[in-house]
Amino acid sequence: MKKLFVYVALMLPIVLLSLNIQAQTADEIIEKYITAIGGKEKWKQVKSMKVNGFIEVQGIKINFTQQAIHNVGVRVDAEFQGQKIIDITTPTKGWSQNPFGGRSSLQPISEEELKQKLDELDIQDEFIDYASKGSTVEFLGKDEEDGNEFYKVKMTSKNNNESVYFFDVNTSLIYKEEKTVKQQGQEMKMVTKVFDYKTIPFGIKIPHKSEQMGQILVTDKIEINTTIDENIFKGN
């Protein structure tokens, strides 16, 4: 028993020190990232956002508009072959209309679908004041891809959604996000690469292109703190 006590007494400070270094490393990476995208104070001024762009799939372009009010609601509207595609998320409910996915009219989404989408309501970037939002982070070390080095940080949100982010060692910007999502009852790994970062007139830096499962999303226009009618977040 005495030997065990001595072992614990010796090891505990080392374990605590290791955990402290790990947390500090993750926080340092996050702090540099926030600085690189315009700074905490600027991002905390973002109350609403309207984005126009298009998704390119196998040479076909699908225009979309995304409107969001911070922690109130997110709505995406698109049209393809004359069919409307709508996606609405609020803190308590969500709706979806996608004729190509079996939903010909606006229908409520399941609790599981809503849980996976709740983090999207935070439009001030998930890493801004992440701890006060109920999220935790973990430094996973370094990784390399195409000759470039990246820091890996896992974030677990208050909604228990997990994502692994890859931060470019040189620019401090996010290059990739990996997460597991459930679709039609099956788990699926989702990898999203983001690039073409641009500083918009508001003074924050946002990626204008992303790639996911062979689809390219291109952002043409971003409006910050524009007036958005909250009624657009009402389903049926």
Regions found by a protein language model. Give the residues of each.
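Gly/Pro-enriched, hydrophobic low-complexity segments
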Residues: 149-235
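N-terminal mature ectodomain segment of secretory-pathway/periplasmic proteins
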Residues: 28-102
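Bacterial Sec-dependent N-terminal signal peptides
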Residues: 1-26
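Flexible, processing/modification-adjacent segments and terminal tails
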Residues: 22-35, 96-161, 182-188, 195, ...
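Residue-level detector of high-confidence beta-strand sites
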Residues: 88, 142, 176-177
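Structural motif
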Residues: 57, 80, 145-146, 201, ...
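Well-ordered beta-strand positions enriched in small/hydrophobic/aromatic, beta-favoring residues
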Residues: 51, 76, 94, 137, ...
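Catalytic loop of the DD-peptidase/beta-lactamase superfamily, centered on the K-T-G motif
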Residues: 69, 85, 90-93, 102-107, ...
